[in-house]
């Protein structure tokens, strides 16, 4: 994963960090410290970040742009610009852009580190 910033960089323009791929969502690390990661997810129409969990890390998702669904444990939330979702450690979660043509942008923080990514083998959203 490309790291755009560092501990020294404290100001970002999210529009400049946005980049969309045709086949799979893009994740960029804007910065990291010894205690947390801060990423941007660029999710094109119809794409998703598949169901996974972080055994020892909490995650906060903020939806900057777009509409979609966010699975968090047994709940599925309709999300839109301005929504915030807290994902406690070890809770399976996924994000899906449900719009036919618009992009989705989500920023997120993960802490504490290391943040281990474990795939969960079930379809998150039907």
Where are these regions (language model features)?
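A short, N-terminal "cap"/entry segment at the start of jelly-roll beta-barrel domains
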Residues: 1-36, 121-126
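Well-ordered beta-strand scaffold positions
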Residues: 34-36, 41, 75-77
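Structural motif
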Residues: 67-69, 76, 92, 103
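Short acidic-glycine-tyrosine-enriched beta hairpin
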Residues: 74-89
